[in-house]
C-alpha cells in the first residue's frame, strides 16, 4: 500500500467545488489510483477534508495502519460487518463540517460502472437514507484523464506484454488449431511476461466469427483461408493494454485484402487526426470517409476508440455512453483506435487496435506492434 495523498488532495479540492461530502471507493481502479494497490474487496472512504479511511479485514490491519501513517483504518471481523463499518464511518464524515446542516441531503459519490456491484449500490442507498448518492465521474474523470509519466510507463509495459502474447498466438495459427489453444497459450505467455491478469476474456475469433466485435473463442478450428481476429488485454499494476490484430491463414482473397487494407488505412488516418479538441465523433467521421472510399461505408460502425487506463473503458466511453462521442480529447489522454470490427455479414471482419496518447501532433502509440496480417498456411 502506498497512499497517494497528492491525488487525494486534488480529489478533495474538486469535492469542495462540487459540494460532495465524501467518495466511497468500492471498485478496483479507483482504489488502486488512490491507495497504490488492490484488494479482493476494495473499500475506502475519502472525506471532503482530512485523511482517508481504509476498510479491511482484521488480518490486514498492521499493513494498512503502517501505510495510513496514522490515518483511520476501520477493521471488520465478519463479512457482514463490512457494510456496517462503511455506514458508521460515512455517518461520521457527513455529520461533520456543517455538511448535515444544509437544506439538502449531503452528497456522497461512488463510481457507477461495471465493476461496482449493483447490489451493493442498492444496499448502500437502503442503509444510508440520509445521504444522496451521486456518480463520482465529475471528480474522477478530470483526475484520471491525463496520464502521469509513471502511468504511461505501466501502460506501455502492458502493451509490450500484449505483443508477447500476440507473438505466441501468431506462432500457433495453423490448420485445425483451436481458438481455446491459441487463447490459452497467449494468456500463459502474457502471465509469464509479467501480466497480473486480463481486463477482458481473451478473444480469438476464426472465420465467420470474426464478424463479432467480442466473440470470445470460436467453437470450430482454424482452416486455410480463414481470417483470425485476436484481441488481448493484459494488465500491469492495474493498467490495461488493448492490442487487436487480424491475420489470414494463407493468401488472402480479394475481399479479405480489401478489408485489411481499408482498416490499416483508417487506423492511420484516425491516429493522425487524434489531436486535442477533436471528438470521437470526428474520428468516426474520418473512419467512415476511408470506408466509403473503399466501398465499405455501409459496414462502418461508430465508436472507433475509447479511453483506457486503470479501467478498460474510461471516458470517453464512446461505445457505451453516446454523449461521450462529443467530448473533446485532451492532450495526455490515452485512447484506443480500432475498437469496432469492419465486418461484411456472412463473410468476416477485420480490426487492428492499439493504445495511443493524444498529442498536438496526433496519436502517439504507446508500444508499436506490426500489422502484417499474413500467416503461411
Feature map (PLM): residue ranges:
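Active-site neighborhoods and metal-handling regions in enzymes and metal-associated proteins
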Residues: 1-377
Amino acid at each position: 500500500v502506498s497512499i497517494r495523498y497528492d491525488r487525494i488532495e486534488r480529489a478533495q479540492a474538486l469535492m469542495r467545488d462540487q459540494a460532495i461530502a465524501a467518495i466511497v471507493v468500492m471498485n478496483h481502479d479507483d482504489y488502486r489510483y488512490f491507495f497504490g494497490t488492490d484488494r479482493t474487496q476494495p473499500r475506502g472512504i475519502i472525506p471532503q477534508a482530512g485523511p482517508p479511511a481504509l476498510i479491511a479485514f482484521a488480518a490486514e490491519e498492521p499493513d494498512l495502519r503502517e501505510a495510513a501513517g496514522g490515518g483511520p483504518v476501520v477493521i471488520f471481523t465478519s463479512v457482514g460487518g463490512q457494510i456496517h463499518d462503511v455506514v458508521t464511518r460515512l455517518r461520521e464524515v457527513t455529520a461533520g463540517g456543517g455538511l448535515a446542516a444544509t437544506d439538502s441531503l449531503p452528497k456522497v459519490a461512488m463510481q457507477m460502472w461495471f465493476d461496482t456491484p449493483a447490489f451493493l449500490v442498492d444496499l448502500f442507498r437502503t442503509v444510508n437514507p440520509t445521504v444522496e448518492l451521486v456518480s463520482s465521474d465529475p471528480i474522477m474523470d478530470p483526475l484520471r484523464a491525463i496520464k502521469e509519466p509513471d502511468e504511461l510507463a505501466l501502460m506501455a509495459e502492458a502493451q509490450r506484454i500484449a505483443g508477447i502474447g500476440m507473438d505466441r498466438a501468431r506462432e500457433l495459427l495453423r490448420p485445425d488449431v483451436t481458438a481455446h489453444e491459441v487463447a490459452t497459450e497467449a494468456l500463459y505467455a502474457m502471465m509469464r511476461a509479467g501480466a497480473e491478469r486480463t481486463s477482458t476474456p481473451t478473444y480469438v475469433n476464426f472465420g465467420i466469427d470474426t464478424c463479432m466485435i467480442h466473440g470470445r473463442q470460436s467453437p470450430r478450428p482454424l482452416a486455410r483461408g480463414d481470417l483470425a481476429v485476436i484481441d488481448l488485454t493484459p494488465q500491469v499494476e492495474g493498467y490495461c493494454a488493448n492490442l487487436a490484430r487480424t491475420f489470414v491463414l494463407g493468401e488472402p482473397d480479394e475481399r479479405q485484402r480489401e478489408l485489411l487494407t481499408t482498416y490499416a488505412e483508417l487506423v492511420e488516418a484516425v491516429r493522425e487526426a487524434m489531436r486535442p479538441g477533436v471528438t470521437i465523433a470526428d474520428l468516426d467521421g474520418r473512419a467512415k470517409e476511408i470506408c466509403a472510399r473503399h466501398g465499405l461505408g455501409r459496414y462502418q460502425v461508430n465508436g472507433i476508440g475509447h479511453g483506457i487506463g486503470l479501467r478498460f473503458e474510461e471516458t470517453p466511453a464512446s461505445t457505451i455512453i453516446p454523449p461521450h462521442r462529443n467530448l473533446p480529447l485532451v492532450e495526455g489522454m490515452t485512447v484506443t483506435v480500432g475498437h469496432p470490427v469492419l465486418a461484411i455479414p456472412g463473410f468476416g471482419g477485420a480490426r487492428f487496435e492499439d493504445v495511443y496518447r493524444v498529442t498536438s501532433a496526433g496519436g502517439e502509440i504507446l508500444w508499436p506492434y506490426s500489422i502484417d496480417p499474413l500467416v503461411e498456411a
